[in-house]
Amino acid sequence: MISLGHLLVLGAALFCISLAGIFLNRKNVIVLLMSIELMLLAVNVNFIAFSRQLGDTAGQLFVFFILTVAAAEAAIGLAILVTLFRTRHTINVAEVDALKG
C-alpha cells in the first residue's frame, strides 16, 4: 500500500520538476504552459493524499474543481497561443513581450 509519505514525495518531485521547467526554459510558451499544468497536478496529488489520509472526500471533490479550471485554463492558453502564432509567427516569449498600441 502506498503511504502518505510516498505520495507527498511524488507531489514534491512533480512540483520541483515544474519549477525547473519554468525557470530553465523561459523562451517557449508551450513549455511554460505545460509546467504550470504539471504544478497544478502536483497540488492535486497532495490534495488527494491528505484527503485519503484523513478519510475526508472534500479534498477529492476539490481536485475535480481544480481539474475543471485547469482544463479551461489550458484551452484558453492554447487559443491565445494559436492567435499569437498566427499574428507574430513565433511562440518565443522574448519576441512577443512588446505590446503594440
Swiss-Prot record:
The keyword ATP-binding does not apply. It comes from the Bacteria. Its main location: membrane. It is found in: Cell inner membrane. InterPro entries: NADH_UbQ_OxRdtase_chain4L/K (IPR001133), NUOK/Mnh_C1-like (IPR039428). The chain crosses the membrane at residues 4-24, 30-50, 62-82. One of its GO terms (cellular component) is NADH dehydrogenase complex. It is a multi-pass membrane protein. Its EC number is 7.1.1.-. Keywords: Cell inner membrane, Cell membrane, Membrane, NAD, Quinone, Translocase, Transmembrane, Transmembrane helix, Transport, Ubiquinone. The keyword Transmembrane helix applies. One of its GO terms (biological process) is ATP synthesis coupled electron transport. PANTHER family: NADH DEHYDROGENASE SUBUNIT 4L-RELATED, NADH-UBIQUINONE OXIDOREDUCTASE SUBUNIT ND4L. Belongs to the complex I subunit 4L family. HAMAP family: NDH1_NuoK. NDH-1 is composed of 14 different subunits. Subunits NuoA, H, J, K, L, M, N constitute the membrane sector of the complex. NDH-1 shuttles electrons from NADH, via FMN and iron-sulfur (Fe-S) centers, to quinones in the respiratory chain. The immediate electron acceptor for the enzyme in this species is believed to be ubiquinone. Couples the redox reaction to proton translocation (for every two electrons transferred, four hydrogen ions are translocated across the cytoplasmic membrane), and thus conserves the redox energy in a proton gradient. This is NADH-quinone oxidoreductase subunit K. The lineage of its organism: Bacteria, Pseudomonadati, Pseudomonadota, Gammaproteobacteria, Lysobacterales.
